[in-house]
């Protein structure tokens, strides 16, 4: 059977290459034996064939077994001429081992010759010699075989099996940081975004900074990535030095395409001193990005992770575990299964394909996250929850940038799980950013959530890209969806100072919002913040202050599946709802050294969830308003009022700016003091020390 397969392959090669013999231009010039050096190009094929056959005939010594058994039959030889001109035997198909050994002996005596060439460059070629044993006497051919020729006589023919030169003809160009001019998303990282935030917010620029992630091509107009990277190059000369400190591991560039490929890690070791728990995270990843033509770009990353975190983090993950027996949901990452009885295993993959038909449009299909706002937090849409499938359309012209995003989300609670499948729901967002003046920008936001009820699936009514869905919601039924609207604004006082704001209104009811009676329908929130670049004249020092305030019941819904959540996490603010929060942030980077300091002070309200008090106080986006504590008199942080403090310091070194590989150390101090200790919310403090090496491709949120 094996011999049959080989014969079949050789037969196919014979048939294919017999045709190729008529087109010498496929490798332009045959290999040249010394005795063929004076032949014309057209005569080299015949001279090569005759010389190979003559060397075989003149040196071949017939094994005794051939005459003893009066054997007559085929002897097929497959060989190559490499780029250095060495002739190497690849395979012999013969009935006797002695025949194979004799052919090998003969080919060992073949001289080194001038290799075949294509476009003047040496190229690799293969050939098949079909002989019949006994060989008889050598008779030179007088012309090269042609396609129509039928073998007669002894059948001792040599057929050129040259490799198609198309592979060698592929252009191999030098990678020139094409990613910085591409329509690939810049990975969401608060520290990395702070590096080019000053350039994007110069007075007089027509940039739009709320819709994130940014495309490299958007930012590159204001911030020269190549220049910045060149300023911190280590100029290592060895291959390993360049790849480790300055460059992507693998780069490929051709005529109309480019690709980079990199391994990565997120390795952490630490300790939660208050519970005496050793923590770790072991993430291995590989990511690739590239471009095909001028209009298509892509990015993809695959993570394989195991981890055990500080006690408060682990409890948070377990509390949000999905139906079906999985151990938890890692905040911002995804569903995790149990690993070694006390840890989590949470694989994940993200990526996107980006299509830019013109300078005014960009379309993306991906699995990842989006963010709307200029702050550390967002009340409109943040990257707090797990990645999700999305389709996004960005339209940019004049002083306007208009973003439409359609998302597929999941409700993983046991109450809505059917036959082991999580409940699917959909979200459609519109955000219109308008630069009114060279200093002032305003944004209009709208979002609607609907579920797959009555086999409704993805409701095409929400494909309408024109902002405000409210009329559509009523046309599909009063309980057909949950709509939110919002506003944002930013004002640039100087090139170094700007202020920003957001307002979210969930289920707008003017009488309840402005009535002043604390209606549960007053579901609003706002954000105020400011940034100061190169603060106090220190280049690279970035200061930010932010205040967030969200009333109880905001983002929730009487039909819980229609809330503003995904995978048991908020799609907006990390703290969910029913809180006030002040954040102070300082960031600094000098060349490759960086540091971050963050302090958060908040007042939060939770449910008691006890037999004596099971009312819904509006402290969770997954509560049902049908069980609300009161229609009126609802106050901020009501219920189990909790004082929350979080401080975090991180310092590190950027190992490789091309891949965002960093080494760092961090310490977190967290203080959580509820008014009443319950099973879920009880007084605790955490001091969490961490050391790590990380490829920085997403934001970790530990501040909840």
Regions found by a protein language model. Name each.
Residues 3, 346, 440-704:
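Exposed, low-structure sequence patches enriched in small/polar residues
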Residues 6-7, 20-154:
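Charge-biased low-complexity segments
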Residues 7-15:
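Bacterial N-terminal signal peptides
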Residues 28, 318-331, 617-632:
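A solvent-exposed, charged loop/short amphipathic helix patch at secondary-structure junctions
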Residues 71-73, 123-125, 280, 345, ...:
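Residue-level preference for beta-strand/loop junctions
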Residues 79, 91-94, 129, 135, ...:
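A mature extracytoplasmic/lumenal domain signature
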Residues 111-112, 263-269, 667-670:
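Generic short beta-strand segments
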Residues 161-441, 447-452, 515-524, 531, ...:
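Outer-membrane beta-barrel channel domains
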């Amino acid at each position: 059977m094996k011999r049959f397969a080989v014969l079949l392959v050789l037969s196919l090669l014979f048939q294919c290459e017999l045709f190729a013999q008529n087109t010498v231009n496929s490798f332009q010039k045959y290999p040249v034996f010394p005795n063929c050096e004076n032949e014309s190009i057209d005569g080299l094929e015949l001279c090569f064939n005759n010389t190979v056959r003559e060397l075989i005939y003149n040196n071949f010594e017939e094994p005794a077994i051939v005459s003893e058994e009066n054997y007559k039959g085929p002897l097929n030889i497959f060989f190559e001429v490499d780029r250095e001109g060495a002739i190497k035997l690849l395979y012999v198909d013969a009935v006797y081992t002695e025949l194979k050994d004799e052919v090998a002996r003969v080919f060992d005596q073949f001289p080194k010759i001038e290799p075949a060439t294509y476009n003047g460059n040496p190229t690799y070629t293969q050939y098949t010699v079909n002989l019949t044993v006994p060989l008889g006497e050598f008779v030179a051919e007088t012309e090269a075989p042609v396609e129509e020729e039928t073998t007669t006589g002894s059948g001792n023919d040599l057929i050129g099996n040259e490799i198609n030169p198309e592979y060698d003809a592929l252009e191999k160009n030098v990678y020139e940081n094409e990613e910085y001019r591409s329509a690939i998303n810049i990975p969401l990282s608060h520290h990395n975004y702070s590096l080019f935030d000053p350039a994007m917010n110069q007075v007089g620029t027509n940039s739009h900074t709320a819709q994130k992630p940014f495309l490299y091509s958007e930012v590159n107009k204001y911030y020269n990535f190549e220049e910045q990277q060149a300023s911190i190059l280590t100029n290592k000369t060895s291959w390993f030095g360049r790849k480790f400190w300055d460059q992507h591991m693998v780069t490929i560039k051709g005529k109309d395409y480019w690709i980079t490929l990199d391994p990565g890690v997120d390795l952490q070791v630490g300790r939660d001193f208050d519970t005496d728990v050793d923590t770790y995270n072991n993430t291995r990843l590989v990511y690739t990005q590239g471009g095909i033509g001028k209009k298509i770009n892509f990015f993809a990353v695959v993570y394989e992770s195991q981890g055990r975190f500080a006690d408060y983090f682990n409890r948070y993950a377990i509390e949000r575990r999905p139906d079906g027996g999985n151990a938890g949901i890692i905040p911002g990452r995804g569903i995790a299964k149990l690993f070694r009885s006390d840890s989590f295993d949470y694989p994940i993959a993200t990526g996107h394909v980006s299509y830019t038909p013109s300078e005014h449009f960009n379309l993306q299909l991906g699995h990842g996250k989006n963010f709307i706002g200029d702050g550390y937090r967002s009340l409109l849409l943040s990257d707090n929850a797990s990645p999700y499938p999305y389709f996004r359309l960005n339209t940019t012209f004049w002083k306007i940038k208009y973003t439409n995003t359609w998302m597929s989300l999941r409700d993983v609670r046991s109450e809505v799980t059917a036959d082991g499948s999580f409940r699917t729901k959909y979200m459609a967002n519109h955000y219109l950013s308008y630069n009114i003046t060279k200093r002032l920008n305003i944004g209009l936001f709208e979002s609607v959530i609907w579920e797959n009820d009555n086999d409704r699936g993805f409701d095409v009514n929400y494909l309408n890209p024109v902002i405000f869905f409210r009329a559509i919601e009523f046309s599909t039924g009063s309980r057909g969806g949950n709509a939110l609207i919002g506003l944002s604004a930013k004002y640039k006082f100087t090139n170094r100072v700007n202020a920003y704001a957001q307002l979210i209104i969930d289920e707008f009811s003017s009488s309840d919002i402005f009535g002043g009676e604390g209606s549960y329908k007053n579901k609003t929130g706002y954000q105020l913040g400011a940034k100061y670049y190169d603060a106090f004249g220190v280049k690279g020092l970035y200061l930010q202050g932010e205040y967030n305030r969200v009333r109880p019941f905001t983002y929730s819904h009487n039909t819980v599946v229609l809330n503003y959540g995904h995978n048991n996490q908020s799609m907006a603010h990390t703290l969910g709802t029913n809180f006030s929060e002040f954040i102070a942030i300082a960031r600094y980077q000098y060349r490759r050294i960086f540091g971050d300091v963050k302090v958060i002070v908040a007042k939060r309200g939770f449910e008691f969830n006890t037999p004596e008090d099971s009312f819904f106080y509006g402290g969770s986006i997954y509560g049902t308003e049908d069980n609300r504590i009161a229609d009126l008199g609802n106050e901020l942080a009501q219920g189990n009022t909790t004082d929350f403090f979080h401080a975090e310091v991180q310092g590190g070194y950027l190992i490789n700016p091309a891949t965002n590989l960093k080494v760092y150390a961090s310490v977190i101090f967290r203080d959580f003091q509820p008014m009443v200790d319950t099973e879920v919310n009880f007084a605790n403090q955490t001091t969490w020390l961490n050391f790590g090496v990380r490829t920085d491709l997403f934001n970790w949120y530990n501040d909840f």
